């Protein structure tokens, strides 16, 4: 009998499941020429969900449907960035880098909309929370999300509108924690100005927590602009920042050619992922700048001690693992405990790479899972869900920034594959 997960995959990917059976490492699940929403905030109503149930844990949640206080809907400006799956819901973020974005945090209900090739997005938890003019408790701009082992959705609201030539820091950046069992806000922590003055560099968040110690969670937040690694501790409700030269971009790796666009980006530390538990209970934290082909590592024990952040010299606590090889610049990466493999979203290769952590870190041991320069243009996010499936978002961002998207072609895609199949046939087996 097919498992529920396999049946769900059949429903949302159709014939492409047969391609996977022949060894294709990534399955294209959804694709869009342009994004659309069940509630654009312009009077276009949610056809599936006209009845709104208020949530007392979110400010003014009765305004689930209706007009937007965040400006008129401009479809072309909506570019997805992050993707995270949890138990039938696929969370999709749309940072406010341009005007006309109705909701920055959204989801796809796979049971209701998984049949569609280009499903409409639903505002999460509702449209009201996504209206940044309504309340300081509402969302401005979210890049990526993360789900921890306690079933909580974590993300950073940058608090910034990144409109070209008109950036506005609407409010301080903040860390949000939502209980996905009931969609209630558990925590909103406003990041002090002494830690971060502007929020546009806070593009990802990684959660370090045990299933039986949910209140003792640590969040690692790379800051690609200020080249820092921020650490937030949930139980003490405190945050501190590490600085290190390893957080800087590599000037020899900042020249990119993606989607026919040639440009230079100086993005510093971009992604952090946790390795397996060691006998002493510690875990390695692997990290890298986006404009770099190097990988670095530090123990989580180092990061979790606030007094360590004040040191002027970190000694040998931070280590260079080595280089992944030419053209392996990566946005996000994620460790999979089932296979012991780290998977990388590789922007220059328009694909997914891998490294098996039991092998020496070297160019020879860095494998290629998938590469497609015409369809997986700029893989902006890569996550792994609790069932062992990789999810990748590709969004053609360089074309959007430096040229013009062809709205008659598919520009945004979400991909999926099990980690067991993804590593098959590579040096990561």
Swiss-Prot record:
Query: One GO CC term of this entry?
Result: extracellular region
Residues carrying covalently attached carbohydrate according to the record: 133, 372
Please state the pathway this protein functions in, per its UniProt record. Answer: Pigment biosynthesis; melanin biosynthesis
Alphabetically sorted, this entry's keywords are:
Glycoprotein, Isomerase, Melanin biosynthesis, Secreted, Signal
One GO BP annotation here?
indole-containing compound biosynthetic process
EC? 5.3.3.12
Report which reactions are catalysed by this protein. Answer: L-dopachrome = 5,6-dihydroxyindole-2-carboxylate
Q: Say which family it is in.
A: Belongs to the major royal jelly protein family.
The protein depicted here goes by the name: L-dopachrome tautomerase yellow-f
């Amino acid at each position: 009998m097919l498992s529920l997960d396999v049946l769900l995959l059949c429903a949302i990917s159709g014939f492409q499941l047969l391609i996977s059976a022949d060894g294709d490492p990534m399955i294209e699940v959804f694709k869009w020429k342009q994004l659309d929403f069940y509630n654009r905030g312009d009077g276009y109503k949610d056809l599936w969900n006209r009845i709104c149930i208020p949530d007392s844990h979110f400010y003014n949640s009765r305004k689930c449907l209706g007009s937007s206080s965040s400006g008129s809907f401009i479809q072309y400006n909506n570019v997805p960035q992050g993707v995270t799956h949890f138990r039938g819901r696929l969370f999709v973020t749309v940072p406010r880098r341009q005007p006309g974005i109705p909701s920055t945090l959204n989801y796809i209900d796979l049971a209701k909309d998984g049949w569609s090739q280009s499903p409409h997005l639903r505002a999460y938890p509702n449209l009201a929370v996504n209206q940044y003019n309504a309340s300081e408790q509402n969302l401005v701009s979210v890049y990526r999300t993360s789900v921890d082992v306690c079933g909580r959705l974590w993300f950073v609201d940058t608090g910034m509108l990144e409109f070209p030539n008109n950036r506005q820091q609407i409010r301080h950046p903040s860390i949000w924690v939502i209980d996905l069992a009931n969609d209630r806000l558990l925590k909103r922590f406003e990041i002090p100005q002494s830690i971060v003055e502007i929020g546009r560099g806070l593009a990802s968040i990684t959660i370090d927590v045990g299933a039986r110690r949910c209140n003792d969670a640590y969040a690692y937040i790379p800051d690609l602009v200020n080249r820092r690694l921020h650490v937030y501790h949930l139980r003490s409700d405190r945050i501190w920042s590490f600085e290190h030269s390893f957080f800087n971009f590599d000037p020899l790796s900042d020249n990119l050619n993606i989607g026919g666009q040639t440009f230079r980006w100086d993005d510093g530390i971009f992604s952090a992922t946790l390795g397996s538990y060691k006998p002493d209970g510690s875990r390695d934290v692997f990290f890298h700048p986006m404009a770099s082909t190097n990988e670095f590592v530090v123990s989580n024990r180092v990061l979790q001690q606030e007094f360590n952040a004040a040191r002027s010299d970190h000694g040998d606590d931070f280590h260079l693992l080595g280089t992944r090889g030419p053209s392996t610049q990566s946005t996000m990466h994620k460790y999979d405990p089932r296979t012991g493999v780290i998977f990388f979203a590789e922007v220059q290769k328009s694909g997914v790479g891998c490294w098996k952590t039991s092998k020496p870190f070297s160019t020879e041991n860095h494998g290629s899972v998938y590469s497609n320069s015409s369809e997986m243009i700029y893989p902006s996010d890569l996550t792994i869900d609790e069932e062992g499936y990789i999810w990748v978002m590709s969004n053609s961002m360089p074309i959007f920034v430096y040229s013009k998207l062809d709205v008659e072609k598919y520009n945004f895609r979400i991909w999926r594959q099990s980690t067991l199949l993804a590593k098959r046939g590579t040096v990561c087996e």
